[in-house]
Amino acid sequence: MDVDRVHVDELSPEMIKVRDYVPEYAVIAHRGSTFWTPEETESAYRWAREIGADYLECDMQVSKDGVVLALHDDNLKRTTNIETVFGETLPREIRKNYYMKIGYSETEAEEKVKADEANFVPNLPAYYTYEELLMLDAGSWFNNENLEEALPGLAKEKQYISTLEDLIMYSKGYRLIRDRNQPGMPRQYSIVGKTGETITSLSGTADIVKYDFGYEIDPVWEAGNKNIPGIYIEFKEPWLNPKGFEQIVYDVLANTQDMNIIEKPEPEDTPFYINNGTINVGNTNGKVILQTFSLESLVRVAEVFQGKVPMCFLLWKGTGATDLTYDDPLGYASFINLGVKYKAHFIGPCIAGAPNDYPELDQPWQDYLIHRAKMKNHPYTFDTYDQMAKYFGQYNFGVADGMFNPPYLDALFTNHSDMSINYMITHGWRKSPASQTLVDAREVLRKLGYLDNN
């Protein structure tokens, strides 16, 4: 069946309105950056904000005590020093002191620790309190594995596993308050106490605990363009997070910097760019985009957010339960139709090419099908100039006629926001009022202090 004959459902006018909350050709900083910085840390998100990305992207998980994390891996070994800090066992004394700190007697705390030990799985984030996760270093691995891009500043300024609240605050021009006179410059935080609610996840049922985190205006942001990017946040597979996780995220957005536009919408005429190119996406109704690969998560997000917040249905070709198995027009259209049915505004297909060599799900005819549904196309993940040139149509994609016109995207996830922004400015795709100034990744790292040996 050809692409003109296959049936695709279309977004309603109401859904199109929400779709258009998002700027055209938005640059989405995938995990902040996986190339220049340790992913999903303060350094990554400060860099992406200052380089001029339109969105800061993260994956979401949750700690044992209900703190929403900005964290990709479900095994902490790759991006932290957990093997050195905790090994394969539950940190018994730390956990016991934590329970006493939030109001349990010593006897009660001991019983709770025994129950936790009986159900403990090492290295999985859901089995650790956020206080325990704060003891991990989420930045040193980057220097060990990336000698050419190593950042001397990480040796003096410890990088933490970020929270969703952290991500929001970075997007608003803040940085962590740190004790800059202590080794590692530890972040400021306190445990307020139990909220009275519980959370049931892989690690069992636990108290939700309120933390108070310290933030301050970032002097680099204040001296610069004062960019306010949006955030693009991913719901992982439902087995990884607790039932009701979508509502937890809804509430965090509502209670942090007015990020939930259902609760507090912005004026519809708020511009995406101001003051000669300053990013202002984070002050518009496009300030948050939701995303997921999981059909089950897509359904749950639709129930909670009702299609009133921009949403992307991500595609992967494979044999998993909700993977795209057949990438012919009929199979591809079936996933587009699921996206329309469950209130997604965008499709996010993977792209081919080094270094990831993902399957190709953003061929010209596939982009055409997405647009037939009146959805828009947010492919992932751009790493090279060659990929930018290919999907923006700079060279022939193998299309013999003029039916499928480039570019084959409406926004893009990138690990190199600097490269993507510079390509788009140079080739006329990033137009005024967005900034027309080419960016330098290392200069931004220098301003942030991450190239400083002192």
Across the structure, where does each feature detected by a protein language model lie?
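Phosphate-group recognition and catalysis centered on beta-loop-alpha active-site segments
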Residues: 1-454
